[in-house]
UniProtKB/Swiss-Prot annotation:
Belongs to the cyclin family. Cyclin C subfamily. GO terms for cellular component: nucleus. SMART domains: CYCLIN. Keywords: Activator, Cyclin, Nucleus, Repressor, Transcription, Transcription regulation. This is RNA polymerase II holoenzyme cyclin-like subunit. Transmembrane segments: none annotated. PANTHER family: CYCLIN. Pfam families: Cyclin_N. Component of the srb8-11 complex. The srb8-11 complex is a regulatory module of the Mediator complex which is itself involved in regulation of basal and activated RNA polymerase II-dependent transcription. The srb8-11 complex may be involved in the transcriptional repression of a subset of genes regulated by Mediator. It may inhibit the association of the Mediator complex with RNA polymerase II to form the holoenzyme complex. The srb8-11 complex phosphorylates the C-terminal domain (CTD) of the largest subunit of RNA polymerase II. GO terms for biological process: regulation of transcription by RNA polymerase II. Component of the srb8-11 complex, a regulatory module of the Mediator complex. GO terms for molecular function: cyclin-dependent protein serine/threonine kinase regulator activity. SUPFAM superfamilies: Cyclin-like (SSF47954). The gene is ssn8.
Length: 302
């Protein structure tokens, strides 16, 4: 997975503008008006939270590395830029993306084992017939044009740790922020290095007290980022004002000398703020009920 990102299919074929993503989704709404009216679904970010939590449950049963789960989330996003979710079984897509991601991230699982574990989690949505997963895998690979290598921000974060003298708490929080960005459209909009820099900035600027930041950063960051912290980010491009703390100043100096697009970093941070705001509306029960009704009514579990 160490291939050059700048020459990658991810950069050349799987980065979109916000406008293009909006056009794709609007086209789905226009083309599938009846399905959209019959089966309303929550905000896409709330669905992303639900899918992520289900992937984590599946991954824990097989001690799967975080990077494989992240790759699976990217596969799901890519697949749904080509397919209307209301004509699919999201549980099968999720399971298949997990199975394929494990192979690509060199932690493969046997297909029968994956199907068995998925059935133990979602018995009403996953058939014991392993050929269904095989068929879905073929569809997934086809829709992604066999472009399966995914570059993640985790690697850049590791490099920035020593360069910016990040503490273990800052690295842990930045790692959690990277985990959270997969719940948004950011993996389809920005390069991994921009996401990594955003995560470091958030960890350094908004860092709460020492703590354990495994999983999501939402609980510790939501309030800090919402309650005026964005002003400091806006000041990154401003030479006036009060002197920031030394660690923040070091980050600002590093950014000024780098070729990182500061505007893009700030846009990513704003997207994260929006995620943490909408997260307050999240209901696992609601997502499960709406998806379940859709799958069962349309017999997508067969």
């Amino acid at each position: 997975m160490a291939a050059n990102y700048w020459a990658s299919t991810q950069r050349r074929h799987w980065l979109f503008t916000r406008e293009r993503l909006a056009e794709i989704r609007e086209a789905f709404r226009e083309r599938h008006k009846l399905a959209h009216s019959q089966f309303p679904l929550p905000d896409q970010r709330l669905l992303n939270i639900y899918f992520s939590q289900q992937l984590i449950k599946l991954g824990k049963r097989m001690s799967t590395r975080q990077q494989a789960l992240a790759t699976a989330q990217v596969y799901i996003k890519r697949f749904y830029t080509k397919n209307e979710i209301r004509h699919t079984n999201p549980y099968l897509v999720l399971t298949t993306a997990f199975y394929l991601a494990c192979k690509m991230e060199e932690c493969p699982q046997h297909i029968r084992f994956v199907v068995g574990e998925a059935r133990s989690l979602w018995p009403e949505f996953i058939t014991p017939d392993v050929s269904k997963l095989g068929e879905c895998e073929f569809s997934l690979i086809s829709e992604m044009n066999s472009q399966l290598i995914v570059h993640h921000p985790y690697r850049t974060l590791s490099g920035l740790q020593s360069e910016l003298s990040l503490t273990s708490d800052e690295v842990a929080l930045a790692w959690s922020v990277i985990n959270d960005h997969y719940l948004t459209d950011l993996p389809l909009l920005y390069s991994p290095h921009v996401i990594a820099v955003m995560a470091v900035m958030v960890a350094v600027v908004f860092k709460p007290g020492p703590g354990n930041f495994h999983g999501s950063a939402a609980p510790v960051l939501a309030g800090a980022m919402r309650d005026g912290g964005m002003n400091m980010l806006a000041a990154l491009g401003d030479k006036s004002g009060n002197e920031p703390p030394p660690k923040v100043q070091k980050l600002i100096n590093w950014l000024a000398e780098s070729e990182v697009d500061i505007k893009a970093v700030i846009e990513c941070t704003q997207e994260l703020v929006s995620l943490y705001e909408v997260w307050e509306q999240y209901s696992e029960k609601n997502c499960k009920e709406l998806l379940g009704r859709m799958v069962k009514t349309k017999h997508l579990d067969k």
